[in-house]
A protein has these predicted regions:
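Redox- and metal-dependent alpha/beta enzyme cores, enriched for Fe-S-associated oxidoreductases
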Residues: 1-50, 54-57
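A short, acidic, amphipathic alpha-helical segment used as a generic capping/interface helix at domain edges
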Residues: 49-66, 84-87
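Conserved beta-strand positions
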Residues: 72-75
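Glycine/threonine-rich flexible loop motifs
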Residues: 78-84
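Peripheral docking tails and interdomain loops at the edges
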Residues: 86-126
Length: 126
């Protein structure tokens, strides 16, 4: 829906997106098991509390890609991302000073119309 309405997706920050490649395991560490554990525990995932690493990553990505607005897409079944969307929205709008839209989907065809309407309106205000 974003591309179909003239927008450009510059980064996909979720469980299968950029965050998997952000922090690699330090292969030179003396304690390789500790380095592996450190890498996994520092992933900015919504199940981590506090989740400062996700905010830090989002801030870097917004700056690096010169983002005009954030569409935070979460799956209906991912309750931790849904709960965190309010604080992410506050971070994006107040700390980074750009518009934010939170959308929830189950990837069904029934969602297409609503998502298209919401994303079109969001892109028009950018």
């Amino acid at each position: 829906a974003i591309e179909n309405n003239g927008g450009v997706v510059v980064c996909y920050e979720n469980c299968s997106g950029y965050k998997n490649f952000d922090r690699l395991v330090d292969a030179e560490a003396d304690d390789i098991i500790g380095a592996i554990a450190d890498r996994y525990l520092k992933i900015g995932c919504s199940v981590m509390t506090p989740n400062k690493n996700r905010y830090e990553l989002l801030g870097r990505l917004i700056d690096q890609y010169n983002v005009d607005g954030v569409v935070d897409m979460s799956l209906t079944a991912c309750l931790t991302y849904n709960i965190e969307s309010k604080s992410i929205g506050k971070f994006v709008t107040e700390e980074k000073g750009i518009p934010y839209l939170s959308v929830e989907t189950d990837y069904s065809k029934a969602d297409v119309g609503q998502l298209n309407t919401r994303i079109t309106a969001f892109l028009e205000m950018l």
